[in-house]
Amino acid sequence: MVMSEFVYLYRGEAPSALSPMESQQHMQKWMTWLKQLGEQGHLKDVGQPLERTGKLVKGKQKTVTDGPYAETKDVVGGYSLIEAKDLDEAVKFSLGCPIFEISGGIVEVRPVMKMNM
């Protein structure tokens, strides 16, 4: 079966309301979920969490500003690369993500376009 690649973009607010113990328990849920995806042969790259700071470069003038802003509710907090037979299957796999348990979390599921270089 030919598999396609998809990116999971994890979006949401920082889970600042969690105690250190709750944060550790939540991280363990992430590790368990990602391990299951890997054991099923669907996790191509675990990815990494992203810092909540950075710069934005915008437009023809290449204007540089601070951002994204941590105060923004819809910040990309990390990513993973998975393989699935189609978009529906990729969405199905995302349903077990622990991000849904806190902070109004979102998993954006995007197909990766193949480019011949």
Describe the residue ranges of each PLM region.
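Conserved, structured core segments of small domains
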Residues: 2-117
